[in-house]
UniProtKB/Swiss-Prot annotation:
It comes from Pyricularia oryzae (strain 70-15 / ATCC MYA-4617 / FGSC 8958) (Rice blast fungus). Its EC number is 2.7.11.24. GO terms for molecular function: ATP binding; MAP kinase activity. GO terms for biological process: positive regulation of developmental process. Interacts with the adapter protein MST50 and MIP11. Pfam families: Pkinase. This is Mitogen-activated protein kinase kinae kinase MCK1.
């Protein structure tokens, strides 16, 4: 209250003013006016002040200036009156010179001249966020407020009241290096007229040191933009706006650490839009917004990288004992800017003198303006001070006066009563960025929204509780009505929000109100969650920018003020929930954060600190009478009002009282909630019992009709009679039939696709499901009906007329399709090109399903050029006829044929039937019906076609109504059907065109529609067989090797596949059998070679051979003793006797050679002839097996020249690369070609470190699996060490595997090293892994498990004999071929050792957890041996029996714990009831916990009964083969 004024002066209290008067005016008046006497009966002067004490500050400005910045300030000193205002009824006030309009930007920096000594070093143990009175002798029975830290409140104790008052209401520019105790009018004018650019160009941007801002000139900013790839438009924008220095750095680090949004949106983006428009680039708002975000992130990184660490700051020398350190982890080197509770003010807090009569003096508002801002951190030197100088004049610091306030109705100095949510940190938690703590003290709403300079918020003057008699505050009008009533009930009247007992949630940081900040935040722009450590007090944590679980845990821990340790547990919770039993793991925590966290804080987490964590037992947000004191900056050190002689008992008593108060409040709260719940339940039950509506039972079978339903459904009856069925053909129909007879129209569908005819008594109807991809999965067996055209239009009738095409296949029920006219060509794109319709009619292309391998993707791109249009007009077919049309009179054209007799004959088989097939592939199209090929064929082609071992339809030239004659060749295992084009339909130009017509993917080796590979199905869907067999690869080379013309003759035929006399090559003279075979078997398998000429078998090898493999097929053909083959090859080439072969022919030749030399021989003891024995598919022969498979191995290419062939961009020709290098050895013998050419095809798999592609050795025609691993340092994010380790692991894998050769191990064929990748060539295995087969088809039968186990154990025994540990044996790493062969793969973590069954201490924990042996997990420095693979094999056997992995009910951690404790994987009960005891015994032997007692691979293979060969077993008869054979 002002002197001389009346206490009963009523007037309306306007909102709070924006800022206290300028510092210079305060100093000017304080220099000439003596201090006023204290008012009577209200305040009492502080004792011990002495005559030298500075005068107290004047009263703060009236609250009316909050919404009226023009209102002058009336505060004056002593008897100097202020000008009277409209609301001021005081009399006797002297006139005062008008004060210039206040410019907030001019006072955004710290006033110079305030020599504040640095704070003392914190030598004692730091406190946690929650204060415990028994830990610090300073606080005697008081609880400090925990909403804000006070680390950077740096005001010296030698500062006077005058300086404190002025610094709390005003700031001065850093550029004005003039002492603040001698201000002038010129300085005041310069401060008030400071512009935005000038202020920001100086170093007064909060959180940015001045040395950084001074170094960023405009040229440096432009160069920085150019270096970071910002466009010329951005550079021109910054030049035109002259953005540099602090203004530039503030774009990314100012304003709560998120950048100056106002400047970006009001200046930068509008100017950028103009520049982009003027330059012709065009304004793309989303793109430029993303660029803006990137720029702000880069700027923020610049500022943070230059932050001055606390370790570089000069410690303070003053020994005040009144400092507080409320951060449990705030040590000497901790940067307060990184803490979520970073203080918002940069000034030292003050310890306020205690007056005996509980009163103070009238000039208290400026000193105690910020008492309601929560602070609890120790005062120390500002971390942003340049060069860690103790001088507190810093760019980002604003000295404030005090941390205590008083109410006009109370004379006690203390903290306000607050709810747990009445602090900014309680609401924002750790969500406010690191710089926001410092920014909020110097920013206001206008600055945040408009991007202008720092001006204090109207809410910054929190001193509107004094100087008026009316208790109504303008800020209280913003509160909800309920909170205002609560505040009124507590205090007896509607108290000021800054007064004692206020419940107003006016949480702000040195002036920025919560409402202002929330208005600044974009709606929906941030994501919050609520966290609590005690179930009572919740902190709001901003998780908007959280991307990893580590960041999320750190943010929550920092928000709650607990250490970020590994033992912190998180639970889902709700309000009032007290039991938390199931903690969240990292994945669950991130999933809940992504799905439930929103702008309203729906996600609530209960955080349980680790048991040994130094956490206080009280929450940082507890309410109650919390009193906080700071260190005094307004009086000397001797005037500390805290009593140092307070006893330990008093502190303990205060602690006990505080705990009792918190417990009492908790019990009261729970009692109130319980009462409310009970009352709600009682009210609900009473209302239900008393006035509840009891409805009649609802009968859902007879629902009532809604009056809003449409009643038209009740009148669904025929509105007219059905038309009478036709009794006899009409005249028009007869005319159509007569015309159709002469033209020999064939039937088809309306859209140009062929539909099949079903003659009476032939086959059964085909369901429409054949249209889908499932028809590709029909069994591939010689006895099964061959696949044919799909019944896509079966619902429209099977007797549709239309356009069909010559086809060599039959339908699913062995019914041939009709040939089609040649005038339609489908218009579907092939490799970027389109097929055009010569008759310009609209085509009706069928949409291709995922499993439909239509020939439209297989035909050559220039296929349309070879189609000759037929000028003869043809119409579409007749109307659809139902399947039962033969029961009544026909309603459409009669296009039936008379059925001829079908004769079967058995022509002599021809070994060259593939080559004898005609080049006229007009009948080679598939049944999909997407192509219509001209009805053109030559007589020679007809004659050749008749000799094919296939079903052939011969169409006569007469054009009568009879079907072509049908002949079936039963000599082949798989019958195929083909249509030969009628000769009557061809034109004169057809001879040349048909001869030049390229082969379609459905070439002469295509036997069945069932065997056709649906590549889209196999590669893009979750099917087991992702590696097709060789037959499917050959027939679909276009799909697997895109961009290459596989039918163009580009490869010159050499003598690798054929000798001079044309006889096929011989297999390797070395018996390619495994070491487990007896000598008798070796002799039996080698007998087929005796019939070959000696010159063909004899071969000489040297150790220095570059091919590196004795089993190489190329070595088998090497004939050093004679130069005749080389000379004959040269003569043949020079004389034009050689021929070029296409890629398809090369692959087919290699495949045929492989099939020819895959011979089966019967065991001699059984006395069976080679023709009378049953071939066995068991590929691993043992001593008691009945047959052995002579395997033709792939060519190894180690140490050879490997060249990858890449087609040119505009040409599909293969580059000409010489493949022969003639050199002489010491004996003068010519060397064999050492150059291998290969093509890379489609991706067939990928893993952690690389990808697997399909490849083909163009030199030999063999298919390969190419494992390609990138070794580019950029692929490892610049981690060169990791890349070196990867390359070393690959080298070790190649070195280990290149010499291995076993039927049950995937062969390593070669290696090619490039600058950025390493390619490993592996043996191509068709099919998939056992693991994928289990997931697709379920568990295996015991006979299959026994066979696969024996094969896997055989390969494992071979590895152990070679000294190799696999260490990652599981079902996913065992490949299963379609013939039942198991092959061990994935040797990425295998290791070679000398003592295979001896424990190696260097063996680390490697492998998959659920397949690990106990000694791998609990090695304890002893290491382990190769017997870990035996344990893994037992897990694989259990996996095949159960259909799921071992330890299926356990997670990884639980499985590790149980394995380490010596437990074995449990065998499910359903498995134990179905398998034999021998199988259980085998698994128990593998699961021997003691590795010394665990059997070896050889022992199990040779002695265990489960590994005995079953002579009656055939994989082709198993249920598993029946499931997987239709996969292709």
């Amino acid at each position: 209250m002002y002197p001389g004024s009346s206490q009963s002066r009523p007037y309306q209290v306007p909102p709070p003013p924006p800022m206290s008067p300028p510092l210079s005016q305060m100093h000017q008046q304080m220099s000439f006016v003596p201090p006023p006497p204290p008012p009577l009966n209200r305040y009492q002067t502080t004792p011990n002040l002495g005559a030298s004490a500075p005068p107290p500050p004047p009263p703060g400005p009236p609250p009316a200036s909050a919404l009226n910045p023009q209102a002058p300030w009336n505060g004056a000193w002593g008897g100097v009156p202020a000008p009277r205002q409209a609301y001021d009824n005081r009399s006797g006030m002297y006139a005062q010179a008008p004060i210039q309009q206040y410019n907030p930007q001019a006072h955004a920096a710290t006033a110079p001249g305030l020599n504040i000594p640095p704070p003392p070093l914190q030598t004692d143990a730091p406190m946690s966020d929650t204060y415990n009175p028994g830990q610090d002798p300073m606080f005697d029975g008081f609880m400090p407020d925990l909403s804000f830290d006070l680390e950077q409140e740096t005001m010296g104790s030698s500062q006077t009241w005058q300086t404190t008052s002025s610094s709390s209401t005003n700031t001065a520019s850093v550029n004005d290096n003039v002492q603040s105790n001698a201000p002038t009018e010129e300085r005041t004018r310069r401060n008030n007229s400071a512009s935005i650019t000038g202020t920001q160009s100086s170093s007064n941007v909060p959180g940015i040191p001045s040395d950084i801002t001074a170094s960023w000139s405009l040229d440096k900013v432009i160069a920085w933009l150019q270096m970071n790839s910002f466009s010329r438009d951005w550079q021109e924008t910054f030049k035109s706006l002259n953005i540099h220095g602090a203004q530039f750095l503030e774009l990314g680090s100012g304003h709560f650490g998120r950048g100056n949004f106002g400047m970006m949106h009001q200046q930068v983006y509008p100017k950028l839009a103009k520049v982009c428009t003027a330059s012709g680039t065009g304004w793309d708002q989303p793109r430029e917004r993303e660029e803006g975000k990137r720029m702000r992130r880069l700027i923020r990184g610049l500022v943070h990288a230059r932050a001055v660490p606390d370790s570089a700051r000069v410690p303070s020398s003053h020994g005040r004992q009144g400092s507080i350190n409320s951060r449990g982890n705030d040590k000497g080197t901790h940067d307060g800017s990184d803490s979520p509770n970073t203080p918002s003010s940069q000034s030292r807090s003050t310890t306020i003198p205690t007056f005996p009569d509980g009163s103070s003096f009238s000039n208290h508002r400026g000193v105690l303006k910020n008492i309601d801002i929560d602070r609890h951190s120790s005062p120390k030197l500002n971390g942003d001070s340049p060069a860690a100088s103790p001088n507190p004049v810093m760019a980002s610091s604003t000295p404030k006066s005090s941390t205590l306030s008083v109410s006009p109705h109370s004379s006690r100095f203390g903290n306000n009563v607050r709810n747990s949510t009445d602090s900014v940190k309680a609401i924002y938690g750790s969500g406010i960025p690191a710089d926001a703590q410092k920014m909020m003290s110097n920013s206001n709403l206008d600055e945040l929204i408009n991007g202008r300079g720092a001006r204090q918020s109207p809410s910054d003057l929190g001193d509107n509780s004094a100087g008026t008699d009316s208790p109504v505050s303008a800020r209280d009008t913003k509160l909800p009505f309920r909170q205002r009533m609560q505040a009124k009930d507590i205090d007896g009247n509607l108290s000021s929000p800054n007064g004692e007992g206020s419940l107003s949630p006016q949480m702000y940081r040195n002036g920025l109100g919560l409402d202002d900040y929330l208005r600044f935040k974009k709606p929906g722009g941030s994501i919050y969650l609520m966290a609590t450590a005690d179930g009572w007090n919740y902190r709001v944590v901003d998780v908007t920018d959280v991307e990893t679980v580590l960041d999320l845990r750190s943010e929550i821990s920092r928000g709650l003020g607990i250490p970020d340790e590994d033992g912190v547990e998180f639970y889902l919770t709700e309000l009032g929930k007290s039991d938390h039993s199931q903690p969240l793991d990292d994945n669950q925590l991130m999933n809940h954060n992504k799905s439930r966290a929103d702008a309203e804080g729906t996600l609530k987490l209960f955080v349980k600190p680790p048991p040994m964590s130094q956490q206080s037992t009280w929450s940082a947000g507890d309410t109650g009478q919390r009193h906080r004191f700071g260190t005094s900056s307004s009086m000397s050190r001797q005037q500390n009002t805290l009593k140092d002689d307070q006893s330990e008992e008093a502190r303990l008593r205060a602690q006990r009282e505080y705990k009792a108060e918190i417990d009492r409040k908790g019990r009261e709260y729970l009692a109130i909630r319980k009462a409310k719940l009970e009352s709600n339940n009682n009210g609900l039950s009473s209302s239900t019992e008393g006035i509840g509506i009891v409805g009649k039972p609802v009968d859902f079978d007879t629902p009532r009709h809604s009056p809003y339903e449409d009643k038209n459904t009740d009148r669904m009856f025929p509105t007219r009679n059905a038309p009478a069925p036709p009794v006899a053909p009409s005249a028009t129909l007869n005319r159509v039939n007569s015309l159709m007879t002469g033209q020999r129209r064939v039937q088809g569908s309306m859209d140009g696709y062929p539909s099949q005819r079903v003659p009476p008594g032939v086959g059964t109807t085909t369901s429409p499901k054949e249209m889908s991809e499932d028809r590709r999965r029909q069994p591939m067996s010689g006895s099964q009906p061959m696949g044919g055209i799909t019944s896509a239009l079966v619902d429209m009738g099977r007797n549709l007329g239309g356009v069909a095409l010559p086809n060599r296949g039959v339908s699913a029920n062995n019914v041939p399709s009709k040939p089609s006219p040649p005038y339609r060509v489908a218009t579907a794109p092939v490799s970027g090109r389109d097929f055009v319709s010569p008759d310009n009619r609209a085509a009706f292309p069928r949409s291709q399903t995922a499993g439909d391998l239509s020939p439209i993707s297989q035909m050559p791109a220039n296929f349309a050029a070879y189609q000759e249009p037929n000028p003869s007009p043809r119409g579409f077919g007749a109307a659809p006829v139902s399947s039962a049309a033969h029961k009544r009179a026909p309603s459409g054209p009669d296009i039936d044929f008379t059925e001829p007799e079908v004769s079967f004959d058995r022509p002599a088989p021809s070994t060259a039937q593939n080559e004898a097939q005609s080049d006229d592939d007009s009948g080679d199209d598939s049944d999909d019906g997407l192509f219509v090929i001209p009805i053109a064929a030559r007589k020679a082609s007809m004659k050749k076609a008749k000799s094919r071992a296939s079903v052939t339809f011969d169409a006569s030239d007469s054009g009568d109504g009879k079907r072509p004659a049908l002949t079936v060749n039963t000599a082949r295992d798989r019958k195929s059907v083909s249509f030969n084009s009628p000769q009557s339909a061809r034109t004169g130009d057809d001879d040349d065109d048909s001869g030049r017509q390229r082969r379609t993917p459905k070439s002469d080796m295509w036997d069945s529609e069932d065997g056709k590979l649906g590549r889209r199905k196999s590669f893009k869907m979750d099917v087991w067989a992702n590696r097709p067999p060789a037959e499917a690869l050959i027939n679909n080379l276009e799909d697997f090797f895109p961009g290459m013309d596989v039918d163009q003759p580009v490869l010159e035929e050499g003598d690798q596949e054929q000798n001079i006399d044309g006889s096929p090559v011989a297999p390797s003279p070395i018996a390619e059998v495994d070491e487990t075979q007896s000598p008798g078997h070796l002799q039996i398998n080698a007998t087929p070679l005796n019939s070959l000429p000696p010159s063909r078998v004899q071969s000489m090898y040297n150790e220095s051979d570059t091919l590196g493999s004795d089993e190489s097929t190329l070595k088998a053909l090497e004939r050093p003793p004679s130069f005749q083959s080389l000379a004959q090859r040269s003569v043949r080439r020079s004389g034009g006797l050689g021929r070029m072969k296409s890629i398809r022919e090369k692959a087919r030749g290699a495949h045929e050679a492989h099939k020819r030399y895959t011979q089966t021989s019967m065991a001699a003891p059984q006395g069976l002839s080679r023709s009378g024995g049953t071939p066995a598919t068991e590929t691993q022969p043992t001593q008691n097996n009945s047959s052995a498979l002579l395997r033709r191995k792939s060519t190894k290419m180690f140490n050879a020249n490997i060249v990858q062939i890449r087609p040119n961009r505009d040409s599909m020709l293969v580059p000409d690369i010489p493949q022969d290098s003639i050199s002489s050895s010491s004996r003068g013998a010519p060397k064999h070609p050492t150059t291998f050419r290969w093509f890379k095809g489609q991706l067939i798999g990928k893993g952690t470190y690389g990808r697997v592609y399909l490849g083909m050795n163009a030199t030999t025609g063999e298919f390969l699996a190419v494992k390609e691993v990138e070794v580019n340092p950029r692929a490892a994010a610049g981690d060169k060490k990791r890349m070196k380790e990867l390359v070393a692991a690959l080298d070790q894998e190649i070195e280990t595997m290149q010499h291995l050769d076993h039927v049950n191990i995937v062969q390593y064929l070669g290696c090619e090293r490039k600058e950025t990748s390493i390619s490993i060539f592996l043996e191509y295995i068709s099919g998939g892994s056992i693991g994928s087969c289990l997931r697709k088809n379920g568990k295996f039968e015991e006979s299959v498990v026994q066979s696969l186990t024996r094969q896997t154990l055989s390969g494992l025994a071979y590895l152990h004999r070679e000294g190799i540990l696999h260490r990652d044996l599981k079902a996913d790493n065992i490949l299963l071929d379609v013939d039942g062969t198991a092959k061990i793969s994935d040797f990425g973590i295998s290791k070679k050792t000398d003592n295979i069954y001896g424990n190696d201490k260097s063996n680390s924990m490697q492998g998959s957890v659920f397949w690990m042996a106990p000694e791998v997990i609990r090695s304890q420095g002893e290491g382990y041996s190769a017997k870990v693979d035996i344990w893994s094999l037992g897990c694989v056997v259990l996996e095949m029996f159960a259909g799921r992995r071992p330890w299926a009910k356990e997670e990884a951690v639980g499985a590790i714990y149980k394995i380490a404790n010596g437990e074995i994987p449990p065998i499910p009960e359903d498995v134990q009831d179905t398998i034999s005891p021998i199988a259980v015994a085998f698994m128990m032997d593998c699961f021997t916990v003691d590795s010394h007692d665990r059997p070896t691979a050889n022992k199990l293979l040779s002695q265990h009964p489960f590994c005995e060969l079953d002579p009656n077993y055939n994989f082709l008869d198993s249920e598993l083969y029946a499931k997987i054979r239709g996969t292709y």
